[in-house]
Amino acid sequence: MKKFAGLITASFVAATLTACNDKDAKQETAKATAAANDTVYLYTWTEYVPDGLLDEFTKETGIKVIVSSLESNETMYAKLKTQGESGGYDVIAPSNYFVSKMAREGMLKELDHSKLPVLKELDPDWLNKPYDKGNKYSLPQLLGAPGIAFNTNTYKGEQFTSWADLWKPEFANKVQLLDDAREVFNIALLKIGQDPNTQDPAIIKQAYEELLKLRPNVLSFNSDNPANSFISGEVEVGQLWNGSVRIAKKEKAPLNMVFPKEGPVLWVDTLAIPATAKNSEGAHKLINYMLGKKTAEKLTLAIGYPTSNIEAKKALPKEITEDPAIYPSADILKNSHWQDDVGDAIQFYEQYYQELKAAK
């Protein structure tokens, strides 16, 4: 009996310990889940989160936001591919032409529109675009439109009606281009009358040869702080984004920008949830907050890019909304192109772009 009793006691103790361990494990899991739900990891462009922008969100929801700086769509894509299921981001900010690519490859979660009441505040003209029909995977945040910027103390603007004007000999060693393969190739493709989203290697090569003719005019390539070169006076003519125009004008730089007759190639930066997101609930809350009227207004005031929020646009000063260099007119938008994913052809763009930068 003692031996049997001992076996019973041992079994009881083992069962008790197992139950305790299971309980501890469940408690730890619950704690980890609670901690995860208290934090949202945001991967976005550096300038899109000016100081204090997210303070109100944390105050309202109790959710802490950890921000990582997004350097390029290509880097973001590669990082998410490499991380796989262990991906550490809840909200990302892909440009429209990467939304279609990532959605196709199963890298994005479908949005729950019932958790995004901000949808009713967004401009219908920005929604349901070919890159994301029905906005299943993304919501638009800001619009980018590159044009030809110039120092108004030196130029009056009549010199700039076409992208081809940047090739004029009078601009030798004076032109700043955006440090982005697609942006640079866009202007050459439009100059020669081709689709800026071409995937034809022969046409891409033709655009490269056209850019080699432009190379003697190129002083610099700059996408990090392209407005600063104009503010300092180092550059007086070049390719610039509309948001950068606002930044330069805030600094009282003598600068204006025009959109050439071929039209700009537009892009939209969006907010989306990666398929590997751990806090989908918090992600929806953050997207709702970032696209909301108050936040959208603050962001456009800070960095100049047009917002998708109609109510925020109404609240913005006219010096922004009525400046055609910042908010392109309806006619310009009709004459514009959308930057799309070029698939595997991106390798040709990147290869020729590196050769272009190395050329003298």
UniProtKB/Swiss-Prot annotation:
Enumerate the subcellular locations listed in this protein's record, separating them with semicolons: Periplasm
What is the superkingdom listed in this entry's lineage? Bacteria
Q: Name one GO biological process term.
A: polyamine transport
Q: Per the record, GO CC terms?
A: periplasmic space
Specify one Pfam family: SBP_bac_8
Task: Assign the protein's first listed, main location to one coarse class.
Answer: periplasm
Q: So where does this one cross the membrane?
A: none
Gene Ontology MF term list: polyamine binding
* Signal sequence range: 1-16
The keyword Signal is annotated on this UniProt entry: yes
Q: Which family does it belong to?
A: Belongs to the bacterial solute-binding protein PotD/PotF family.
Q: What is this protein called?
A: Spermidine/putrescine-binding periplasmic protein 1
Gene designation per UniProt: potD-B
